[in-house]
Amino acid sequence: MSTPRPPSSHPERRFRDAMAQFATGVTIIAAPLKPGQYVGFTANSFNSVSLDPPLIVWSLARHSRSLAAFESATRYAVSVLAQDQVALAHRFSRPHVDRFAGVDFRLGAAGAPLIEGAVAWLECRHHALHPAGDHMLFIGEVEACALRTAPPLVWHGGKYLAAAD
């Protein structure tokens, strides 16, 4: 039996700690800027919204340096990472690095990077953008998707974990 952690006295920290108990998958969301240049970041704020049409949602902080690039992108791709891709998750969450240098990826039909070795890939067209507090919600219509059978990478309690059966 686990021992409950004492709650933080700061409401924002308590909210973050509570949300950290919700296990999520880990993705890299990427878009083309211009030929040979791409923008991408690690995200766990990703979910399906609708089956008809197929829609997904993800969020990006309003203070993110890549916000303007994604706001102007008409297409992007979501790569759902495999449990052996922790290094990629770290790389795409760090500022001031060429995130795509040396990374094995291919371009989808609309030119967005698809990370090799991921467990799923979704190629999306921009559908809607909504402000939500200190983040922007991006809704994408899935134009193509593919998957492979492999264990996904999981984010829980502020750390990366392997999925359990």
State the predicted function of each range.
Residues M1-D165:
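Basic, polyanion-binding surface patches
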